[in-house]
């Protein structure tokens, strides 16, 4: 054994003690504290490059001198490495604190100990103050405060519901489990009774409603049945169709439409909501006017429409930060889940598409996209094609399209998308994602509300640029295609050949089966062609022209060309166009989903075209439901009313038809009068004799022998 080695009999235990103390830093001791005048110097030496050799020098000294290292020596060497903590030091720091600092620490400690009680107290005070304001507003003018009162009640209901379900959900389930088991035992017979009763009720309602309003409702019902049959015939797996989501989806469509379009409370509520949305979006003008000047409306689309997209995107981002949008999406998704039996992923995405776009809604379930089934992936794409984003909803409203019908179409299209998707591509696999996982949604990466607003405005820049660029490109392309078709048609003495004319013949059967008036079927078919081959912006822009011409009460026919549609046809067209189902969106969906889930690229590409067709038919089915429920009177056949009898009677129908005839008549002077709508001068003279219109000089009409 070498001389430098420690004696195993004596120094084995001390050596172990020394090694353990060297590897574990000890707390500083007051006995080993250095002079305070040299504290900074010691710290600088500790941070110097040579301080790593301190431990090795101690070990070497112990080995050469065979001296025991006591705790005090180790503590002195290790003091700069350890934190300076100690009760006496803390008490010394306390004595050095000022009076205000000690009081502040006391208050902070009190708040930490009673944090829950303080939070509840603050919320109670705020809630009490808000309820006092609501009561005061109702006492002053209840009719004026009715919306605030309803919103408050709905909010309180859902907050209390969430708290009760979070705390007593299992108990409620245990109480209801006997009734649930009873229903499950007899459900095979009960479901047939329920479905047959509902079908009979719908048939009876249609019969009575048709007798009151006319036969157009039956055509819409026939169109709905036709689309269901077509989807079943061309289904991916016709024998594997699960009919519960199909019937429930159509049923929810019908119930929502019935509530909104036929009941006064529902219509008033959605009409009020639509007007509030219009008013809210009107605040965009303040920013647009400041940026673009007072004459910003001279460039209506660029400076009036597109800023609405920026504003709405900002608001949506703020609502996401607050968690309100996620809460609404979870509630709507849960409703579709328990009624339709769709998977949690499908329900969440379909509910999300009511508020966000087809590329944003898959982000709600981004972690689970690589694991969804092919049918679920098809449903996700179909839901995107069948609905529109909330950010562009305001732009369509600014065109002059009815905000009530646009909001209704957005809500009705969500269950329609699930029903169509499950019929066109039935589920043949077992979904892997559970309800609990799918309902978890992030609040975004914004750190505060102001940052969320900034991110929302910035994220709208690509969307605005995309809308403007696509409109420029598509309208230019449409003009070129029409010129080329006109040139080609002129070779056969038919220069009227155009893209609109071709689309009107392709989509005319579909538009007619939705229930539009017979004379408007080609006009609606043209709009569907615009929407399918270009985008819905182009289609709604043309629809707004028809609406404005009708409101201006101008001539309905000019040189034999119809200028606008009936109100019923406008309503059905609004529902049929309310979706992103077009070939431009096809590339957007494939690119967006592929970037989110690269492993599913092949499945996305193979199912995208079927999803586009399914989304289009979902919009058509929503239009059929609107046609069944629309109580707008069918357009009067004025040719039959005015020309079937020689003597006109002063009835409402005759007066309406004569007024339309007056508006469409062109009178240049005596004996130079051209009746509109292909009516005869005799009919025009008869209407003049009956009503004597102030806008037309009936003396200019030549005498008819």
Curated annotation (Swiss-Prot):
Query: How is it placed in the membrane, per its record?
Result: Multi-pass membrane protein
Keyword Repeat in the entry? The reply is no
A Pfam cross-reference name: Nucleos_tra2_C
Composition-biased stretches, type Polar residues, lie in: 48-63
One of the GO biological process terms: nucleoside transmembrane transport
Q: Please give the NCBIfam families that the UniProt record associates with this protein.
A: nupC
All ranges on the Cytoplasmic side of the membrane:
1-119, 167-190, 237-244, 323-346, 366-378, 426-460, 595-607
Chain intervals with Basic and acidic residues compositional bias: 1-21, 65-74
Q: Which UniProt keywords apply?
A: Cell membrane, Membrane, Symport, Transmembrane, Transmembrane helix, Transport
Q: Where the protein is mainly located, per its record?
A: membrane
InterPro entries hit by this protein: C_nuclsd_transpt, C_nuclsd_transpt_met_bac, CNT_C_dom, CNT_N_dom, Gate_dom
Q: Any idea what job this protein has?
A: Sodium-dependent, pyrimidine- and purine-selective. Involved in the homeostasis of endogenous nucleosides. Exhibits the transport characteristics of the nucleoside transport system cib or N3 subtype (N3/cib) (with marked transport of both thymidine and inosine). Employs a 2:1 sodium/nucleoside ratio. Also able to transport gemcitabine, 3'-azido-3'-deoxythymidine (AZT), ribavirin and 3-deazauridine.
Official protein name in the record: Solute carrier family 28 member 3
Q: Which GO terms describe its cellular component?
A: brush border membrane; plasma membrane
As one GO molecular function, the record gives: purine-specific nucleoside:sodium symporter activity
Intramembrane-annotated stretches: 347-365, 525-544
**Where does the record place it?**
Cell membrane
- The question of whether Nucleotide-binding is a record keyword is answered with no
Gene that this sequence comes from: Slc28a3
Q: Which residues lie on this side of the membrane: Extracellular?
A: 141-145, 212-214, 265-301, 402-403, 487-524, 545-583, 631-705
Q: Which residues cross the membrane?
A: 120-140, 146-166, 191-211, 215-236, 245-264, 302-322, 379-401, 404-425, 461-486, 584-594, 608-630
The family assignment reads:
Belongs to the concentrative nucleoside transporter (CNT) (TC 2.A.41) family.
- Location of region: Disordered: 1-96
**Which reaction(s) does its UniProt entry say it catalyses?**
thymidine(out) + 2 Na(+)(out) = thymidine(in) + 2 Na(+)(in); cytidine(out) + 2 Na(+)(out) = cytidine(in) + 2 Na(+)(in); uridine(out) + 2 Na(+)(out) = uridine(in) + 2 Na(+)(in); adenosine(out) + 2 Na(+)(out) = adenosine(in) + 2 Na(+)(in)
